[in-house]
Every structure is written in structure tokens, then in C-alpha cells.
């Protein structure tokens, strides 16, 4: 179904069954598969391939040579019915690739809202990306990576499969991430190690002075004391009773399966 207000260049191929909502603009030489749905006011520049079971929300901008919903690169994949879901207001720049999920994951690769994926970013199968994230040129995510809200990842950075990147994290360029990065932290290097807190980012996003001080205290517990992760978790729970923002650390440590960067 193609809405009558959609604008589609005659050189583009829209397979029967695709759903194109109102005021979508599809430029030249695009291919849209039969199981694709594109939300209102989304713009496809040119030379874009969208395949598989792919749901794209409203007001996204997708640039030339992007490939969305293609078969993943997991050798176990056997043409199972898996998909990708993309939210609203995302900018997906040139040559970005986002692959469909696997049955070994949750059958879905999921992108939130208001993200910027710069040129040549690769998001592998079963990744879950939150909202308001920025991935600079040539960032590569392995399968099953989770990136929480308001995270910034510098160019040429590679993240190992199954890693979790916490909210408000900033990762410097050319880093190699092989373990989980707790919230609010600046990380850099190969292998990535912590370099303090993303204080400037927290201030820009309106965190109160008391919350920032509490986050500093949490960082000291986790990285400047001799505590094990388990004993640090208990100390953080006590701090969270007075400062609920510290529950971000506690919940993250509960989720972490690969261990945290040290």
C-alpha cells in the first residue's frame, strides 16, 4: 500500500506488499522489499536498499547507499523470520548497514528515536540502541550489543558482541570495547579503560549539582576504592537510597554479563 501523498522516483522499485505512509519521499534508484513499512514523512535520498521484515517510523532521514534489514552475518542464520525496528527522527547517513536479528537473540535489531548514525556505521544483528545516541563514522557494533540512551561513540570504534554501553557514556575514537561500560563514564583506548565521568555531558543535559556529586561518589566507589564489583554494588545500593540516580549504576551492574571495564 502506497499512500497517495508519497513521492517516489520512477527509477525506484517498491515491491508489492510494502507499506509506504503519507508524505514519504523516496529518491532515485532505491529498492524497498515487500515486507517493509516506512512511516510518515520519512526521506530516502537515493540508492538505498531496505529489505526483510523492516519497520521504520516517522520523520527519519536515510542517506544514499544505506542498507537496512538485510540478512545478518551470523553463520547460524537459516532464513528464520527475524526483523529490524527503527523508531522516529533518526538520521541514518551514507553507507550505514543495519542487519536483521536472529532467533538466538530476540529476533529483532531495534533502534530507538532521535539517533545519528554517521557514515559507514555498522549495527549487527540483535543490537538494541536507545534514544539520542550518536555514532561517528565507521563505528562497528558486534551482534547483541546494547547501547543505552544519550551515548556518544567516537569514530572507528569497535564494540565486541554482547557488550552493554550505559546511558550518557562517551567513548573516544579508535577504541576497542570488549567489556561493559557503566553509565556516565568516559572511556578510551584499545582495550577501552575508564577516564573519569562525562561531567560536561551531564551538565548539558540538566543534571542537578547534587546528582552530579552523587555520581562522582559512585565513580569513586566503583573505580577508586579497593572494593570488588559485588561489594561496590552493595555500597552503591546504600548511596542510591539517598540519591535515586545511582540506581543507574546498580541496575547496570545487575545486567552486566561480560564484566565492566577497569
Curated annotation (Swiss-Prot):
SUPFAM superfamilies: Trimeric LpxA-like enzymes. It is an enzyme of class 2 (transferase). It catalyses: a (3R)-hydroxyacyl-[ACP] + UDP-N-acetyl-alpha-D-glucosamine = a UDP-3-O-[(3R)-3-hydroxyacyl]-N-acetyl-alpha-D-glucosamine + holo-[ACP]. GO terms for molecular function: acyl-[acyl-carrier-protein]-UDP-N-acetylglucosamine O-acyltransferase activity. Keywords: Acyltransferase, Cytoplasm, Lipid A biosynthesis, Lipid biosynthesis, Lipid metabolism, Repeat, Transferase. It holds the Pfam family Hexapep. Coiled coil: none annotated. It is found in: Cytoplasm. The keyword Transport does not apply. GO terms for biological process: lipid A biosynthetic process. One of its GO terms (cellular component) is membrane. Pathway: Glycolipid biosynthesis; lipid IV(A) biosynthesis; lipid IV(A) from (3R)-3-hydroxytetradecanoyl-[acyl-carrier-protein] and UDP-N-acetyl-alpha-D-glucosamine: step 1/6. NCBIfam families: lipid_A_lpxA, PRK05289.1. PANTHER family: ACYL-[ACYL-CARRIER-PROTEIN]--UDP-N-ACETYLGLUCOSAMINE O-ACYLTRANSFERASE, ACYL-[ACYL-CARRIER-PROTEIN]--UDP-N-ACETYLGLUCOSAMINE O-ACYLTRANSFERASE, MITOCHONDRIAL-RELATED. HAMAP family: LpxA. Involved in the biosynthesis of lipid A, a phosphorylated glycolipid that anchors the lipopolysaccharide to the outer membrane of the cell. Homotrimer. This is Acyl-[acyl-carrier-protein]--UDP-N-acetylglucosamine O-acyltransferase. The lineage of its organism: Bacteria, Pseudomonadati, Pseudomonadota, Gammaproteobacteria, Enterobacterales. The gene is lpxA.
Amino acid at each position: 500500500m502506497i499512500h497517495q501523498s508519497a513521492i517516489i522516483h520512477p527509477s525506484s522499485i517498491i515491491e508489492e506488499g510494502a507499506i509506504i505512509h503519507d508524505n514519504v519521499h523516496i529518491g532515485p534508484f532505491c529498492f524497498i522489499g515487500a515486507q517493509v513499512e516506512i512511516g510518515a514523512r520519512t526521506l530516502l535520498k537515493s540508492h538505498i536498499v531496505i529489505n526483510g521484515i523492516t519497520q521504520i517510523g516517522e520523520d527519519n532521514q536515510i542517506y544514499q547507499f544505506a542498507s537496512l534489514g538485510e540478512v545478518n552475518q551470523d553463520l547460524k542464520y537459516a532464513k528464520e523470520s527475524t526483523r529490524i525496528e527503527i523508531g522516529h527522527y533518526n538520521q541514518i547517513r551514507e553507507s550505514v548497514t543495519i542487519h536483521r536479528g536472529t532467533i538466538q537473540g530476540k529476533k529483532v535489531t531495534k533502534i530507538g528515536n532521535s539517533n545519528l548514525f554517521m557514515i559507514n556505521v555498522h549495527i549487527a544483528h540483535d543490537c538494541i540502541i536507545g534514544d539520542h545516541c550518536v555514532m561517528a563514522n565507521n563505528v562497528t557494533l558486534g551482534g547483541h550489543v546494547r547501547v543505552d540512551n544519550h551515548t556518544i561513540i567516537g569514530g572507528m570504534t569497535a564494540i565486541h558482541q554482547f557488550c552493554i554501553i550505559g546511558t550518557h557514556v562517551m567513548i573516544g575514537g579508535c577504541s576497542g570495547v570488549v567489556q561493559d561500560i557503566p553509565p556516565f563514564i568516559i572511556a578510551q583506548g584499545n582495550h577501552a579503560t575508564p577516564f573519569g565521568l562525562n561531567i560536561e555531558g551531564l551538565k548539558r543535559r540538566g543534571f542537578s549539582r547534587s546528582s552530579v556529586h552523587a555520581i562522582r561518589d559512585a565513580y569513586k566507589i566503583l573505580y577508586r576504592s579497593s572494593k570488588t564489583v559485588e561489594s561496590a554494588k552493595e555500597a552503591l545500593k546504600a548511596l542510591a537510597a539517598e540519591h535515586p540516580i545511582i540506581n543507574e549504576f546498580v541496575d547496570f551492574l545487575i545486567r552486566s554479563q561480560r564484566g565492566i571495564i577497569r
